[in-house]
UniProtKB/Swiss-Prot annotation:
Statement: the UniProt record of this protein carries the keyword Lipid biosynthesis: no
GO biological process, one term: tRNA-guanine transglycosylation
Assigned keywords, A-Z: Cytoplasm, Membrane, Metal-binding, Mitochondrion, Mitochondrion outer membrane, tRNA processing, Zinc
The species this protein was found in: Xenopus tropicalis (Western clawed frog)
Pfam families (alphabetical): TGT
Keyword Amino-acid biosynthesis: no
Chain intervals for the UniProt region annotation (Disordered): 298-321
Biological function: Non-catalytic subunit of the queuine tRNA-ribosyltransferase (TGT) that catalyzes the base-exchange of a guanine (G) residue with queuine (Q) at position 34 (anticodon wobble position) in tRNAs with GU(N) anticodons (tRNA-Asp, -Asn, -His and -Tyr), resulting in the hypermodified nucleoside queuosine (7-(((4,5-cis-dihydroxy-2-cyclopenten-1-yl)amino)methyl)-7-deazaguanosine).
Residue stretches spanning the membrane: none
Protein name, as recorded: Queuine tRNA-ribosyltransferase accessory subunit 2
Length: 413
């Protein structure tokens, strides 16, 4: 795996990761995102349906927490999760946890990290972890780490222990890896821990960079774009080598993505469009930093604040918890005001859903609890999100990243 940076603007890095995959014949542009999956499959979608989506990332994101309990089956299969899940040619990145599912805290020890799957808790020692990676056969995988500590709410002693444990797990995994020829083509991604303590974040970053890892995961950030988190991200990326990619999980809102991109982060998960789909919502934010004057007025009226968030008191079947999580970048199609709205989800969108169906139809599917609702929303939300990353790269090439950041900022609540 080789990262080539072609341009740096306001901290944002434009480049290409080449020589990826078992055959080293694929590339991934950065800034970019990964294709989020549940147990190896894109949520709501078949692989045939996935082919209808434009701009699908070259790297697929799988999660050890959802696959560890199926290890015996995969051991019998003997050909890895890629072929088992119908993706024999996919480049796979395996993270330890599913960014969508919060993990209970207080279960990690010096010897093992706790994973949480459908069947409950699974204790993962370094030996078991490497054994699982040999069965899954990913191209990249996040090293085992004590990621329970997040910014805020942890003692200094607990934060320091998190960093110490993570470095110990990294050293043990590297030692175990050296004894397995079948894992030599795999790239190990080191995790940077440290909660909200700058000195511990920097210690974790510098010590991890001394080890032979292929990239870095900025772990323990879960969105909100708080100034404290953003300043920590800036400090960590400044301490990392420039020739290796930086990953982050849990920062998926468009405004969060741009804040992180401008602080040197390269790769993101694509959990955000999945969360939006699960709320019965559709992404409608604009990422066109050079709008067509003929359509600018239409787009402005289409994506007004009321349009995105819904009118106050709008009738909806949306649970209160879901409404609280809604962002200004989406509309809730469960609201009854869409019953007779025969426009596409987003004017100008070329996805299958917008070309063939209306807001009213998706509203009906949601009201009737039809499975097709999730399929159509996932198609639209994935494609819109993937195109957003294309706009980020184009804005960097054109020297317009500040214009794009301002456009997104104006749409954020």
């Amino acid at each position: 795996m080789k990262l080539s940076i072609s341009k740096v603007a306001n901290g944002a890095r434009l480049g290409v990761i080449s020589n990826i995959g078992r055959n080293g014949d694929k590339t991934l542009e950065v800034p970019g995102c990964l294709l989020y999956t549940k147990t190896g499959s894109p949520p709501h979608l078949t692989h045939d349906t996935l082919q209808t989506i434009e701009g699908v990332p070259a790297v697929t994101h799988i999660t050890l927490s959802t696959l560890a309990e199926h290890q015996e089956v995969l051991e019998e299969y003997k050909e890895g999760i890629g072929k088992f899940a119908g993706m024999p040619d996919a480049v796979l990145y395996c993270s330890t946890h599913d960014p969508v599912s919060p993990c209970p805290t207080g279960y990690n020890t010096n010897k093992a990290v706790s994973l949480w799957g459908a069947g409950g808790r699974i204790e993962m020692t370094a030996q078991k972890f490497i054994s699982a990676q040999r069965v899954l056969r990913p191209d990249w995988f996040q090293c085992l780490s004590d990621g329970e500590v997040t910014p805020g709410g942890n003692s200094r002693k607990r934060v320091k222990k998190s960093v110490d444990r993570t470095l110990a797990f990294l050293d043990e995994c590297l030692q175990l890896l050296s004894g397995h020829e079948d894992l030599k083509p795999c790239v190990l991604i080191g995790a940077v821990e440290g909660g909200d303590l700058l000195e511990e974040r920097l210690r974790s970053a510098r010590e991890t960079a001394k080890r032979p890892v292929g990239g870095f995961l900025l772990d323990g950030f879960h969105g909100g774009s708080a100034e404290k988190e953003l300043s920590l991200i800036s400090a960590v990326t400044a301490a990392l080598p420039e020739d290796k990619p930086r990953f982050i999980h849990g920062m998926g809102r468009p405004d969060e993505v741009l804040e992180c991109v401008q602080r040197g982060v390269d790769l993101f998960d694509s959990c955000f469009p999945y969360r939006v789909t699960e709320r019965g919502c559709a992404l409608i934010f604009s990422h066109c930093y050079r709008p067509d004057p003929e359509t600018a007025v239409l787009e402005k009226s289409e994506t007004s604040g009321a349009e995105r968030n819904g009118d106050v008191g709008a009738e909806s079947e949306e649970p209160d918890a879901d409404r609280a999580e809604m962002t200004s970048f989406e509309i809730c199609l469960k609201e009854k005001r869409f019953r007779e709205d025969f426009r596409p989800l987003l004017e100008g969108c070329s996805c299958y859903c917008c070309r063939n169906h209306s807001r009213a139809y998706v509203h009906h599917l949601l009201a009737a609890k039809e499975l097709l609702a999730g399929i159509l929303l996932m198609i639209h939300n994935f494609q819109h999100y993937f195109r957003f990353f294309g706009s980020i790269r184009a804005a960097l090439r054109d020297g317009e990243i500040n214009a794009l950041a301002e456009l997104i900022r104006k749409q954020s609540s």
